A protein has these predicted regions:
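Iron-sulfur cluster-binding electron-transfer modules in prokaryotic oxidoreductases
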Residues: 1-260
Length: 260
């Protein structure tokens, strides 16, 4: 496991997770990253409102999906957490969930129904909802971009055409890499905690593919964004798709400089 410190605690974690829910610790991000993610959430909220989507928010009752717990193979902890999340949603009368990232989309839409009997909540990514509404750009983009498709969105949830439709309608010119859509290449994120060296190697290879196509790279996943930004050359901007869409579709969004 290379030199990753987290592996020193796996044996302890296997025992502790039976009595303590560790999902919150696994999901925690750094303050700088958190500010970036918060801005992306504001972008998404503005986009949905501009498209006429009526939605609410559960605040403290908006629980983490448990995606990382699932990926780590902590089955008992994940199942208990999934039931907690589902019960919370049902107790608040939720019939449809709008997700903001690929991992949550996949866990709620494809995994929960397999482990929770009678799961009956509709789950859609905000990108799917926006693509259905086909909003008009109020401030068209004049930019050339390349898309890094999320492995989970593209291969498991069939979210491939929607982001392209939204970017094209926003005025962006898309330059596709050879490995795009369902043939997308990994950002290295799944390896980060156990094999940081290999993760950086994978991310660097992917970044080389992307930067050869365009100077602006569009991501749709916070893990992809973090890993690719870390290895991006100075002349390449790596930004979340919500940044571009908010600039084009939301009239009150200030145009921001490329976030490298």
């Amino acid at each position: 496991f290379e030199d990753s410190w987290i592996t020193n605690y796996f044996a302890i974690g296997r025992g502790v997770n039976k009595v303590i829910n560790l999902s919150g610790l696994l999901a925690r991000s750094q303050p700088v990253e958190q500010r970036t993610y918060d801005e992306h959430l504001r972008n998404i909220a503005r986009l949905l409102k501009s498209a006429g989507v009526d939605f609410g928010y559960l605040y403290d009752n908006d629980l983490y999906s448990g995606a990382l717990v699932y990926d780590e193979g902590l089955d008992d902890t994940f199942l208990a957490h999934a039931r907690l999340v589902y019960d919370m949603l049902k107790s608040n009368g939720v019939k449809q969930v709008i997700t903001v990232d690929p991992h949550t989309t996949n866990i709620l839409r494809s995994v929960y129904p397999k482990v929770i009997g009678g799961f009956d909540i509709q789950v859609k990514s905000y990108l799917e909802l926006l693509a259905e509404r086909r909003p008009d750009a109020v401030r068209p983009l004049d930019i050339e971009v390349t898309i890094h498709d999320s492995c989970i969105y593209a291969r498991h949830e069939d979210v491939v055409d929607q982001p392209r439709l939204l970017l094209k309608q926003a005025g962006a010119v898309i330059q596709e890499t050879e490995q795009s859509g369902k043939l997308t290449y990994c950002c290295g994120g799944p390896l980060e905690s156990l094999f940081p060296g290999k993760a950086e190697e994978v991310a660097s290879k992917r970044m080389a593919q992307l930067s050869d196509c365009a100077g602006c790279v569009v991501t749709m996943c916070p893990i992809c964004l973090s890993n690719l930004k870390r290895v991006a050359p100075p002349e390449t901007a790596v930004r979340d798709i919500s940044d571009y869409l908010a600039e084009a579709y939301c009239p009150n969004t200030n145009k921001s400089p490329a976030n490298k």
